[in-house]
Amino acid sequence: VFVPLALVLMALMTQIPRLRWQCLAASPPIKRIVPPLLGLLVGGLLSLGYRDLGALSWVGLVANVLSLWLVASLLLNFSFKTHGLSANRLGSLLAHLGVAICALGINQVSHYSQEGGTVLKAGSPYQLGAYTFRYEGNEPLIGPNYTAERITLSVHKGAKEVARLMPERRHYSVRTMNMNEPGIAWGLFGDLYVVLGEKMGPDAYAMRLHYKPLVRWIWLGGMLMMAGGALRLSGRKPLLASRPAKIPRPLREQEAP
């Protein structure tokens, strides 16, 4: 139930930039045509780019198109010509951009995330989507109040190494408990992380591997919404108001002698 309602809400939000208080202003054709075309093109390419992660999701495609349509509509309709850049208008822009970016991140994580479990050892790489994980070695560590074993994994995309992950399995002697410290490689367009499991041999370990595309965009969208709300609460005082034209003062009449 939530997904259809969210898609309907996103579709309605794409029309917000065309609304004006108490009326619907006529928009130029370019402002009506360009946003949906950009959303369809970029959203389609974004969805097709994740084909190697699984089957193409039509719900994910529609959500991508609507999110990018909203972004294009907001940016195209936001101008400084009439009222200057006020905190009120900038707050509205940031809040709605935050909704679109957050929705885009949630959609990618929901439909295109990948995870897998395996026993990884030297000479036996593991493929997860477009990424290949290779075991490089292990080393013992002594921390302030724990001992640990750290595993080094190299991550390749094609022939290029894109990251190195170093998950740890820690033992706290005071609490007599073991804890796992995941290895994380974060990026703007996706996060890779590995959780270390039990040791299965001299150079073999059970592991859970994850790929979360655009997961950071969820937090980015939330921060933009918070910033937009704070600006809206700060008032309507213009930040970059256009300067009024100076009107020359009339010459004073000379007083009669």
Predicted regions and their residues:
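Soluble non-transmembrane domains of integral membrane proteins
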Residues: T118-R208
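Contiguous transmembrane helix-bundle modules in multi-pass membrane proteins
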Residues: V1-L128, F133, V215-P257
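Short beta-strand-plus-loop segments that form exposed binding edges in beta-rich domains
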Residues: Y211-P213
